[in-house]
Amino acid sequence: MVTPDRGQAHTLEAVAASILLLSSVAFALQVTAVTPLTGSTSNQRIEDHQSVVAEDVLASQAANGTLKAGLLYWNESARHWHGAPWDGYHDGAPENTSLGRTLNDALLDRGVAYNLNVYFWRNDQRIREQVVYLGEPSDHASVATWTVTLYDDDRLSDADGDPTGTTLADAGEAYFVPDADPNGPVRGVVVVEVVTWRM
């Protein structure tokens, strides 16, 4: 036989258990940082989007010839990029080139930082030429690359971005990419790399 006292004890026990359970859930929510990106694939989507944008910039610039023109924006007398210190640009790519304008419009103006590097081979070593350096990439950085073939008869650009009469063959050792085939028309094959991350 169940007495009224025993029924009240069960009710009290149930209320105490529910309070304990709700308190545990409330505590767990307070100690765990819950953000829109927690437990989702949003970070990966952002990285993928940044990578696709950088790849699209490189592909479109390669298709219309302005990717190579960006690589030819070189001051052979100073032996570095026009208007940049020896270690590249630190505030975005130069606006005098289509590549620079497009990278700045597509990435920098939208809160995405980027580094632009060119890789080439010299004496069996892979060398990196830093074109734009906007900082150390985050752990969630994305990378896009494009391969470009440079020829001896490609002409360097002046500070305004207009082609000069100086070819890569004329520039000789003053250009950063060594002549991989001195007896042939190819100067070298380089890999253009854009590393992107949110600022």
Pin down the residues of each PLM region.
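Long, compositionally biased, intrinsically disordered regions
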Residues: 29-199
